[in-house]
């Protein structure tokens, strides 16, 4: 059984780098000049990628999400005493395939991997198959970024569901050690602190990796624009919609 991800198309003759369809420009008026941290969250279906992002950015947990939206969220954060512009890219799921060769996911995921500076690889501790996607997914990231160290963390989400656990804490740590990152068990539902610790650690790793540069990578001479963001107003709108529907349901009872 292997992960199947659609392989990125290569650039025109004369270059061996991956060519990913240009990402639409995103308004930069609110960005902190020369201090940009770009993170992508990757993993299988139903592991809680969006829930982790929302929990980190808003401290709230929303149980209902539109699946596989692939939205990018942007906000300013304080990191080691400095204000930086953080962009967190949500992604559709990757999946295990029994009878296919290679790795499958939408081209959007390949673009996001190419664009990002740091990587959150997420599985659910209640889903062994989601855990098994992490190593081949990391290997795919390395194929897109073959040189140098890449900041990466492994997050075992849904740590509140201990009775349904299929992946032990030592197994998560062993995998993270093998891939050269840190392992965090987290609960998007019940523990904001665990989620915050994971994301802030990665932000610090990315900031150090950028080494005081301008935060904009040049890959093979190709400058990648920022993805379009629904911004925090859109995130708040979704939260109000979910809250309103729950209030109406309670009133109807």
Swiss-Prot record:
GO biological process, alphabetically ordered: positive regulation of transcription by RNA polymerase I
Reaction(s) this enzyme catalyzes, per UniProt: GTP + H2O = GDP + phosphate + H(+)
Subcellular localization: Nucleus, Nucleolus
GO CC annotations on file: nucleolus
InterPro entries named among the record's database cross-references: P-loop_NTPase (IPR027417), Ras-related_GTPase (IPR051065), Small_GTP-bd (IPR005225), Small_GTPase (IPR001806)
Keywords from the UniProt entry: GTP-binding, Hydrolase, Nucleotide-binding, Nucleus, Transcription, Transcription regulation
PROSITE patterns: RAS
Location (main, coarse): nucleus
Function text: Regulator of rDNA transcription.
Name of this chain's protein: Ras-like protein family member 11A-like
């Amino acid at each position: 059984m292997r992960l199947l991800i659609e392989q990125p198309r290569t650039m025109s003759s004369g270059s061996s780098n991956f060519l990913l369809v240009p990402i639409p420009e995103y308004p930069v008026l609110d960005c902190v000049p020369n201090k940009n941290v770009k993170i992508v969250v990757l993993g299988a279906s139903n592991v809680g990628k969006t829930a982790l992002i929302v929990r980190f950015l808003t401290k709230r947990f929303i149980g209902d999400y539109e699946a596989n939206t692939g939205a990018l969220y942007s906000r300013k954060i304080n990191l080691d005493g400095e204000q930086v512009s953080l962009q967190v890219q949500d992604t559709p799921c990757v999946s295990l395939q029994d009878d296919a060769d290679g790795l499958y996911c939408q081209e959007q995921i390949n673009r996001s991997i190419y664009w990002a500076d740091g990587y959150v690889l997420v599985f659910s501790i209640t889903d062994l198959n989601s855990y098994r996607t992490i190593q081949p997914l990391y290997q795919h990231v390395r194929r897109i970024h073959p040189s140098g160290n890449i900041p990466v963390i492994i997050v075992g989400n849904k740590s509140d569901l201990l009775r349904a656990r299929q992946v032990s804490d030592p197994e998560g740590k062993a995998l993270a050690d093998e891939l050269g990152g840190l392992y965090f068990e987290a609960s998007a539902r019940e523990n904001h602190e665990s989620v915050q610790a994971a994301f802030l650690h990665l932000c610090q790793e990315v900031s150090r990796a950028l080494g005081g540069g301008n935060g904009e990578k040049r890959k093979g001479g190709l400058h990648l624009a920022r993805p379009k963001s629904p911004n925090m107003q859109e995130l708040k709108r979704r939260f109000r919609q979910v809250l309103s529907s729950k209030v109406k349901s309670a009133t109807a009872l």
